[in-house]
Regions:
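Phosphate- and divalent-cation-binding pockets in alpha/beta enzyme and binding domains
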Residues: 8, 115-119, 139
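Conserved beta-strand scaffold positions in the cores of enzyme catalytic domains, especially
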Residues: 21, 129, 206-208
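PAPS/PAP-binding and catalytic site of the sulfotransferase fold
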Residues: 5-18, 120-124, 144, 208-226
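Active-site micro-motifs of SAM-dependent methyltransferase domains
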Residues: 15, 21, 27-30, 138, ...
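P-loop (Walker A) phosphate-binding loop of NTP-binding proteins
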Residues: 1
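PAPS-dependent sulfotransferase catalytic domain
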Residues: 86-96, 112-115, 141-224
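Conserved phosphate-donor/acceptor-positioning beta-strand/loop module used by diverse small-molecule
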Residues: 109-110, 120-146
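PAPS-dependent sulfation machinery
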Residues: 20-108, 114, 153-181
């Protein structure tokens, strides 16, 4: 079963016709936090190379799809076997892949990148953003249960990428000026900092989905995405 609201919504989006979906791409977790520190043309070249050349074309050709049926992000969870088989039984060159992909769109799921989305939208104004909303108490309780920001969690690789200071791994979404503050914080204060950091962002025209609505009334909630 899906582990979180974002995973559920990701599966719904992946199931839509003409959508090529990337689940938490590691390359973008490294690249997106650098959006302010790399020249715009260089950053966009790297971003578009990954999304289009590496992911999109290879997804259409059946080379970068997740065929592990045990994974929540498996293509077999959301697409018909016949449509998947059609990708896997023949070799497709780039010219043909581009023709097939002419009426398709790219979607990707990436939690925790909201502080960087305004700049991303500045670069790509037609980009559409779906934002999962969850209350602070529920979010903090969930984080405490996972222990990601505990003394042990802060030395693990659960939040990646990170920088290391005083043997503590500081998540990529922590402001540079707050590094020392993060190291001194208690676990619950880190959870509160996280909630504020990823929610206190103005994202114009974002589609907002309530986690509580998704759980209580999934059909009507996901119908907003159709």
């Amino acid at each position: 079963s899906a582990r979180s609201g974002t995973t559920i919504i990701g599966k719904v989006i992946h199931s839509l016709k003409g959508v090529e979906y990337s689940f938490e791409p590691p390359a973008l977790f490294s690249l997106i936090p650098l959006i302010e520190s790399i020249k715009e043309n260089n950053w966009k070249m790297l971003y578009e190379t990954y999304l289009y050349e590496d992911f999109f074309i290879n997804s259409i050709c059946g080379r970068s799809i997740n065929c592990n049926i045990a994974d929540d992000s498996s293509i077999y969870k959301v697409k018909s076997k016949s449509s998947i088989d059609a990708r896997l039984i023949k070799s497709v060159d780039k010219v043909k892949a581009e023709k097939i992909g002419a009426d398709r769109v790219i979607a990707y799921k990436m939690p925790d990148i909201t502080p960087f989305i305004p700049k991303l939208i500045e670069y790509y104004p037609d980009m559409r953003v779906i934002f999962m909303e969850r209350g602070p108490i529920e979010t903090i309780n969930s984080l405490l249960a996972k222990g990601w920001f505990s003394k042990n969690g802060s030395t693990s690789n659960m939040t990646w990428p990170f920088v290391i200071e005083n043997e503590i791994k500081i998540p990529f979404w922590v402001c540079d000026k707050d590094s020392d503050l993060w190291c001194a914080m208690s676990e619950i204060d880190r959870c509160a900092y996280y909630y504020i950091r990823v929610n206190n962002v103005n994202i114009p025209n974002a589609i907002k989905i309530s986690y509580e609505d998704l759980i209580l009334d999934p059909l009507n909630t996901v119908s907003e995405l159709a």
